[in-house]
């Protein structure tokens, strides 16, 4: 596994169906998309950075890349359902309900991003990009089964305040 990939993401990937379809939302440089492809998942990586997407496609031609403005454009996945959705270090609240709708029958959502309190460590500091306490939990609680949830201060890979969640449509999830 790549040392740059999130340990939280690595921990819960086994819950996604082997060879399943996975969306890496706001994928950035593709650290998780590349890992997913390496593990045999069918990956779609979406981001607004064309250069990063081109680099991902060059490194792993099997990854479907999509250039999209997730905050200013329309949601490109209305007709799609994924076995897994991975989101790290990204928050645009209007997408949260759309992510839940984009999960397949037994889909798994693995989410990790910054929360209130992170401003003391640097960026992001804008409240629009910081989850409130228990916010991810509150969003999914009535629609998914929560496998794991954490929030608080971390020191690795750098000091930050984060919120992490893994949830699934399965009512009887197996633990990794």
Place the predicted regions along the sequence by residue.
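Conserved SAM-binding strand-loop segment of SAM-dependent methyltransferases
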Residues: 61-73
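Core SAM-dependent methyltransferase catalytic element
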Residues: 154-176
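Conserved alpha-helix/loop element of class I SAM-dependent methyltransferases that forms part
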Residues: 2-19
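Conserved SAM-binding loop
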Residues: 56-57
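Conserved SAM/SAH-binding beta-strand->alpha-helix loop
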Residues: 49-51
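A short acidic, Gly/Pro-enriched loop at the edge of an enzyme's catalytic core
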Residues: 75-84
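Conserved beta-strand signature within the Rossmann-like core of class I S-adenosyl-L-methionine
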Residues: 106-115
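Conserved class I S-adenosyl-L-methionine
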Residues: 20-28
């Amino acid at each position: 596994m790549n040392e740059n990939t999130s340990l939280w993401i690595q921990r819960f990937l086994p819950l996604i169906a082997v060879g399943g379809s996975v969306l890496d939302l706001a994928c950035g440089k593709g650290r998780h998309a590349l890992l997913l492809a390496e593990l045999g998942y069918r990956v779609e990586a979406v981001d607004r950075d064309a250069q990063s997407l081109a680099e991902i496609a060059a490194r792993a031609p099997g990854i479907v890349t999509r250039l999209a403005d997730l905050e200013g454009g329309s949601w490109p996945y209305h007709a799609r359902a994924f076995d897994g959705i991975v989101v790290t270090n990204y928050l645009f609240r209007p997408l949260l309900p759309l992510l839940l709708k984009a999960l397949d029958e037994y889909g798994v959502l693995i989410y990790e991003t910054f929360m209130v309190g992170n401003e003391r460590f640097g960026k992001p500091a804008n409240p629009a990009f910081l989850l409130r306490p228990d916010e991810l939990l509150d969003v999914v609680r009535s629609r998914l089964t929560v496998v794991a949830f954490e929030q608080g201060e971390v020191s690795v890979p750098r000091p930050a305040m984060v919120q992490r969640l893994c949830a699934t449509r399965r009512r009887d999830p197996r633990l990794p």
